[in-house]
UniProtKB/Swiss-Prot annotation:
Probably acts as a transcriptional activator. Binds to the GCC-box pathogenesis-related promoter element. May be involved in the regulation of gene expression by stress factors and by components of stress signal transduction pathways. It comes from the Eukaryota. It is found in: Nucleus. PANTHER family: DNA-BINDING DOMAIN (PTHR31190), ETHYLENE-RESPONSIVE TRANSCRIPTION FACTOR ERF095 (PTHR31190:SF431). This is Ethylene-responsive transcription factor ERF095. InterPro entries: AP2/ERF_dom, AP2/ERF_dom_sf, DNA-bd_dom_sf, ERF_plant. The gene is ERF095. It comes from Arabidopsis thaliana. PROSITE patterns: AP2_ERF (PS51032). Residues 77-103 are annotated as: Disordered. Transmembrane segments: none annotated. Pfam families: AP2. One of its GO terms (molecular function) is transcription cis-regulatory region binding.
Length: 139
């Protein structure tokens, strides 16, 4: 994606990224499966980190049809013979740990604000996932 320079600063604008008044950058994406509802991706120290979080979410939702801030980082998906979504995302973020991360390889997303329905949905998903894991272990 071409980055657009702001009118009054030398900062670049990225798709899905807004600068907060206190200097941090917020990333969000619209989910077409939920009638264009905003999905909060987190708050980041740099615009580039926020843009990469947007790219990961966009690629996860839309695949090769996604309009990305850093399409060259996902080029492997188009060129590679049998690349997968995970391989493309991992290669695109080599040396990059967006939003923090633990030693177990799972990404941690910092939520600045959640409305009650989204929070309840996330909590229900976590409970269902844990119950499924327990049921699988007992079989």
């Amino acid at each position: 994606m071409e980055r657009i320079e702001s009118y009054n600063t030398n900062e670049m604008k990225y798709r899905g990224v807004r600068k907060r008044p206190w200097g941090k950058y917020a990333a969000e994406i619209r989910d077409s499966a939920r009638h264009g509802a905003r999905v909060w991706l987190g708050t980041f120290n740099t615009a580039e980190d926020a843009a990469r979080a947007y790219d990961r979410a966009a690629f996860g939702m839309r695949g090769q049809r996604a309009i990305l801030n850093f399409p060259h980082e996902y080029q492997m998906m188009k060129d590679g013979p049998n690349g997968s979504h995970e391989n493309a995302v991992a290669s695109s973020s080599s040396g990059y740990r967006g939003g923090g991360g633990g030693d177990d390889g799972r990404e941690v997303i910092e939520f600045e604000y959640l409305d009650d329905s989204l929070l309840e949905e996330l909590l229900d998903y976590g409970e269902r996932s844990n119950q499924d894991n327990c049921n699988d272990a007992n079989r």
